[in-house]
Amino acid sequence: MKTWKKTLFLIVTFGLIFLLPLFGSLAKWHGLPPGYGDFPAQKVEADPGFSLLYFSLACVVALIITLVFVFPRLFGFKKTPEAPRQKGAATPFPVWFWWSLPVLAVSWFLMWARLKLHVSLEYYTFVPLWWSFILILDGLVYKRNNGASIISRKPKVMQLLAVVSCFSWFAFEYLNFFVLENWYYPNNEVFSNFGNVFWFSLSYTTVLPAIFEWYLLLKTFRFFRTRYNNGPKLKVSGVFLIIYYILGLILAFGMGYYPYLLFWVLWVALVPMLSAAMALADYWTPFTPIKNGDWSKVMLVGLATVFNGFFWEFWNFGSEWFHDDAPTNPNYWKYSVPYLDKFHIFSEMPLLGYFGYLFFGLNCWIIWLIAAYVFKFDADIEVTGEQS
């Protein structure tokens, strides 16, 4: 397949992600779904409520996923010996690590504290909070990786990550309309319409950088680095990829037609559609190393997103918990999840919802790669250095 045909195939597939849920929704509602176009998203109708059957099935899936991560040897993963690496002089933390600590502390305090100031500074804490956190994570990677991190070695990649992150999360906000707002933002009147678009655009720049910093941080630990890199070798045929691709198309349409039953497809459909499209076009994906038994990229980016998800939910919940429902954080979000909305631990996210982060991380990496392959820039986020 010629290069231009590969690029066109990826663009068409990415376009179908936007069109198929829309077509499904038009068939369902004979028009646009309730709440379509509201930004930020608002809750427009009550979800179906708790379902014991749906919840039980989800628990079974979650249990299997947990077993694979916690006990990989039960599923054919083998222990990989790694020769101890010689340790040189300790690498100090970079300057941006130290600068970011007070920024994070002040931002966190202002977000959670109930201070009556002349200017409502708590409105503007999300972006500095998260970018300082990203720089702290990068500083940890830098120290543990002998001075190698995204900021120190690939600053242009960090800039591109921020740009792609912004546009990719707008894509998820768009898809959210077709599952009738699985998440929504009750503090939508803190800013004007233009203010919401501007501020949320800045906020969305933090998603991909945070996930990839966590991924790189996990890789600096031998425990994670070798845990999933010697597993079952899975080679797939072109026929399988085509079937996998078609399955993604069907799920994307079904998400719009069955917004409650298939709400979870929002986090899953992009994986078969885009990863299969890239594989059919002979592009590298996080699944490519699996043919040699290396599952570490898929597993670690999932874990990285779960770890980061804890902070997303923790800081989000606390921003309203201490404020008696007063609107202080325009980025504050709540969930309206059908069938599974049980068991919250200092979080708006139901406990089972954290498993969705495993797939979300893969989605983010795949979208990043699609952008790189279409716009022809270096997508390699890996950095090398001596690890401990």
Question: For the regions a protein language model found, what residue spans apply to each?
Answer:
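Aromatic-rich, lipid-facing transmembrane alpha helices and their immediate juxtamembrane interface loops
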Residues: 1-388
